[in-house]
Amino acid sequence: MLPKLLTSIFGSRNERLLKQYRRVVDQINALEPQFEQLGDDELRAKTEAFKQRVADGETLDQLLPEAFAVVREGSKRALKMRHFDVQLIGGMTLHNGKIGEMRTGEGKTLMATLPVYLNALAGKGVHVVTVNDYLARRDAEWMGRLYNFLGLTVGVNGPQMTREAKQAAYAADVTYGTNNEFGFDYLRDNMVTEVADRVQRSLNFAIVDEVDSILIDEARTPLIISGQAEDQTELYLRINAVAPLLKKQIGEADPRTGEGVIEAGDFTADEKTHQVVLTEAGHEHAEALLAQAGLLVEGASLYDAANITLMHHLYAALRARHLYHRDQHYVVQNGEVVIVDEFTGRLMTGRRWSDGLHQAVEAKEGVPIQAENQTLASITFQNYFRMYGKLAGMTGTADTEAYEFQEIYGLETVVIPPNKPTQRRDELDLVYKTSRERYEAVVKDIQDCYERGQPVLVGTTSIENSELISKLLEKYKLPHEVLNAKQHAREAEIIAQAGRPKAVTIATNMAGRGTDIVLGGNVEKQVQFIEADDAIPADDKLRRIQQLKDEWAGLHEQVKAAGGLRIVATERHESRRIDNQLRGRSGRQGDPGASRFYLSLEDPLMRIFAGDRVKAIMERLKMPDGEAIEAGIVSRSIEGAQRKVEARNFDIRKQLLEYDDVSNDQRKVIYQQRNDILESKELGAQIAHLRRGAMTDVVRTFVPVESVEEQWDIPGLEKVLRDEWQLDVPIAAQVDKSDAITDEDLVEMVAKTADETYAGKVALVGEEQFSGFERAVLLQSIDTHWREHLAALDYLRQGIHLRGYAQKNPKQEYKREAFELFSTLLDTVKMDVTRLLMTVRIRSTEEVTQAAEALEEKAEAISNLTYTHPTEDGGVAVEADPATEVANRMAEVPRAGRNDPCPCGSGKKYKQCHGRLA
């Protein structure tokens, strides 16, 4: 009660913001007559003047009224479109880093030009993010006319572009592209081995179009770049030879009595969970067998950190041999292991078991072993977009998800009023007992609209339902178009004409999104075709264009008289927002329209959440077959069900983010280290810091902190330094000579000797030459161990929920163990880099250059890169890297060395020319 009272007195937060923005709109409108007097060149010159004022310290907020007035005037001249006052309000909303909810057809694309222009004046770049490549190119070409007219440059960042083309796109003042491509470029930039290969600038300001689709619907699937790891065929074959020598235990021991074992063995196998566990005796037997096979050092344990992968491979081999059976779980076809779906019995061609199990089965069956896929880099959209200095978004439907935008991204949602009040009539839902009755009613409604000349958009939740309705319409001989969000350019054209009289268009939720449905059809497209045709004389062009416009005006009035665009929805989506998006396609710019949802008790949402209640009402009213129930209580029940699903989905996304935040913090540290290494001209201090840490760790293994001489193992320390680090340090002699030597003195002595030895090595070839080798060693080590760390985090994540059974908080356990894994990663990099640099024997400049290039080539040797990303229809796509495909086609050609002249004859080095594609 009190919040409502306060709102009625002071107005809501949304109303107060709109009031504040309207005051600025008055200032912009007052400037319009002044800017109308300027010539085109004078208007364009304003851009340079604004840039200078920003450089001199003026803020963008101070420039806003003038800049918005310039964009509005430029748009009138370049696009023949004038920004409405509500679009100016929307522009301010986006500039202030908020989400603007603007109804479909109110001109979001044009609205975005205002904050884009203003923020581009700072010279740091602005990214406009769209849901698909077609929209990115369309908007860049369409709005690019305005930006170019005002003196700004525009770039399009698309897939399959060369590095140089991407760098040019990012260097532009305004860059259009898809969410997937921006994210993948960020990941690729953090995999390069040279600064010149990076494409992105700093992440300054992004405006996300259809922000709900990108930041909510697609946020459950991370972006992943993966590639084939190093070939471990030999290891799989050798472990496959060990697995048959281990005996399966029959029966399981009771933890209290120890009874229950029928026949003792080396491991137990659980057919239900498909897991194996070694017994105590089995561990000892396995260690002995692995040592005999030369896979395990004599006396080492399978539990040692260094042998974790060995244990993993042994378990995979035992599972493959005892729990996965040919012609039950898989078949062998054409020399490949193909998985059989245990529920349907169908072959799942192309699918592979993870964790090395598939390779273990291949080794068991004696077919060629295919390399394991390894995650090279990954990031969620939540964590990528939160890196921008300023983030804004626009959509037709955000208010239902306002809480999530605020909670996850810190983005406030502002509902922007329409330019003209809506005239769309949203009718109550009709609920039928069966799907068959529902579809009959849908077809009847479509037939009625078709006969009256009213255009219909039929919304479905799946491609399967689209095709079902299409078949029903064919049966009744009703002409129609079907869109499934697959061919964006063609679908945009069909959607643009979906407002013509008698048009029937069936579309899944996402199909044709971003394109307005204009009543009477889209005359602009047809005008563009005539203008682009050079064969038509100029006078004839004008006559034809006028004829088209007159014809359209007649059709427009005809459709308005028939009731505007009718939305017929065949099912409720689990999200109210997506239902609202469908409704919002009708009634644009104050046009008439209508919408209705046809439901059945067999729909998943009804069945799970509201079915029993509605069924009881139907039975009480004794509804005959084919009759529908139409009541507010039903619609409210369904909305309540949708709220429950939305809350559950929000919890899933929030939980995903909480886990990903752990790896994100670690990702930032690793990527920052990589960037420091790439940009640093001299790595001596960094290497010295690592060397000091490594030497301290080695000494502390034999000489504990604050210990006395009797506790020191001097012979052991001298042996390790000599054998593993090639350091001859006379520690024993020094200890005998001195009366008061401490453990700290020993650390100093070893560190000093290591520094002197290393300095001598660097002096042989020169500091500048050796620095390139140091950089290659550091990057190679960080990248290799980071990939292994990502796999380790993945393993940890998959089983962490089981900690709940032990009364432990899985999230806290994940954070703690992930931190321990990360500390181990940093220690491993420190020891690996120092050991390699201390023990490598380099005597000439040529040797150091060759060694650095060999490491770079190894870093680039990861093959068959694939990109995993969410799709608009809610699925997940896995695409091959175009550069990898080119490299595979070139594989038969003898490869040139990195520094050899490129075979194409350009005169450049191979690595700077076609070597980049490989």
UniProtKB/Swiss-Prot annotation:
EC numbers on record: 7.4.2.8
Pfam families for this protein: P-loop_SecA, SEC-C, SecA_DEAD, SecA_PP_bind, SecA_SW
Subcellular location(s) of the protein: Cell inner membrane; Cytoplasm
Record-level Gene Ontology MF annotations: ATP binding; metal ion binding; protein-exporting ATPase activity
Co-factor(s): Zn(2+)
Statement: the UniProt record of this protein carries the keyword RNA-binding: no
Positions with a binding annotation for Zn(2+): 902, 904, 913-914
GO biological process, one term: protein transport by the Sec complex
Membrane-topology descriptor: Peripheral membrane protein
Binding site for ATP: 87, 105-109, 516
One GO cellular component, as annotated: cytosol
Gene3D superfamilies named among the record's database cross-references: Helical scaffold and wing domains of SecA, P-loop containing nucleotide triphosphate hydrolases, SecA, preprotein cross-linking domain
Keyword line: ATP-binding, Cell inner membrane, Cell membrane, Cytoplasm, Membrane, Metal-binding, Nucleotide-binding, Protein transport, Translocase, Translocation, Transport, Zinc
Subunit text: Monomer and homodimer. Part of the essential Sec protein translocation apparatus which comprises SecA, SecYEG and auxiliary proteins SecDF-YajC and YidC.
PANTHER family, alphabetized: CHLOROPLAST PROTEIN-TRANSPORTING ATPASE, SECA INNER MEMBRANE COMPONENT OF SEC PROTEIN SECRETION SYSTEM
Record's function text: Part of the Sec protein translocase complex. Interacts with the SecYEG preprotein conducting channel. Has a central role in coupling the hydrolysis of ATP to the transfer of proteins into and across the cell membrane, serving both as a receptor for the preprotein-SecB complex and as an ATP-driven molecular motor driving the stepwise translocation of polypeptide chains across the membrane.
Family: Belongs to the SecA family.
Record's protein name: Protein translocase subunit SecA
The species this protein was found in: Methylibium petroleiphilum (strain ATCC BAA-1232 / LMG 22953 / PM1)
